[in-house]
Swiss-Prot record:
Gene coding for it: rplX
GO cellular component: ribonucleoprotein complex; ribosome
Quaternary structure (record): Part of the 50S ribosomal subunit.
Top-level taxon of the source organism: Bacteria
Organism field: Streptococcus pyogenes serotype M1
This protein's name: Large ribosomal subunit protein uL24
Amino acid sequence: MFVKKGDKVRVIAGKDKGTEAVVLKALPKVNKVIVEGVGMIKKHQKPNTENPQGAIVEKEAPIHVSNVQVLDKNGVAGRIGYKVVDGKKVRYSKKSGEVLD
């Protein structure tokens, strides 16, 4: 999967289209990512010792990795490729040629 935790991405599809944010978690087995402030859902929590009333909590839901594009250091969104530099496999932006890792 081409997206890693900590990458700055732009959402390219869905209700949050155009939003730029940081990846909080990558879920490679299901090809999804959790992006900060994107895809917010309301989760109903049952009452417990910490919160005897229960609560409605807003949290980020995973979105499919095909709906985001990684931004390079200049803030340009583009596709990601892999190449070997000094014997190490690194990610690079196909648009600018800039190495991301």
